[in-house]
Structure formats: structure tokens, C-alpha cells
Amino acid sequence: MKNVLYILALLLPLGIQAQTALYNSGNIRIHNEGQIGFHTDLINNASFDQNLGLAGFYGSSMISVSGAFMPVFFDTEIANDQGVMLNTGISASSNTNFVAGNFVTPRQQQDIYFNFLQDAFYVGESDPSKVDGYVTINNEQNFIFPVGDSEQLRSLTL
């Protein structure tokens, strides 16, 4: 009987799985001066658009943002050398801080993009940190897009 318990105790961890993404199926809100750091994938299948704090993407392996709804962040930051793959777009309503790594959008899907809302701005763009793919801006006449390819910043002026 003791041997059976030992065997079960050894096999139990094989059936346990860790959560590999933050899955939003309700309402998440970042309150004024609040901060959330994503170190894993984000699957956003519900409203995530009434935010006033900072949403940061951190880590040392690529993070994916996907889901049925586009998240809208107030302040956004990327500090992930491997980048953030956007499988659904994201919007920034205030500051985007490029520290390290690229926001990457699929080249074959123009409807997935990094969106700067009216009066949004960015800092820190560089060869290793920018948007590698599609970017949009809302209600602005003049804007310099922080875009480029996988190796080099190639800003585009509107």
C-alpha cells in the first residue's frame, strides 16, 4: 500500500499544468497610477479599455497579445529583448515607452496594428526598440511613426 502511495505522489505532478497566459474574460481595469507587468502572454476576450495606469511588457522571451478585443492602455512600456507579437492590435492613449524590444505585427494582416490614440506620444524609440509592422494614429495631422524592420528604425513622417 505504501508503494502505491509513493507512486501516486510521484505521478501527481505530471498531471498539474501551470497557467501559460493571462486570460481576460471579464473586466480588468488599471486604476490611476496603477501598474501591471505582463511576463506572459495576454489573451484578451473582454473589455480592457478603461485604463489610467501603466501596462508593461517584460521578460526575456517573446510575449504574445491575442484575443477578440483590442486592449487600450493609458501608458505602455516594452522592456523585452525578444519583443511582443501582436496577434490582435493594441492602443495607447498616452505615453509609450520603448526601452528594449519590438512590438511586432504580422505583415500579411493589415488589420493588426499598434494604435496611437489622439494626443498619444512615445519616447525611447531606437534600432532595437520600435514597432516592426503596422502603426496607426487617430485624429492627428503630424506624427512621426516609430517603425522599422527587425534590425533598424526607419521612422515614417505624416
Where are these regions (language model features)?
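Bacterial Sec-dependent N-terminal signal peptides
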Residues: M1-S25
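Extracellular beta-sheet-rich ligand-binding/adhesion modules
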Residues: Q17-L158
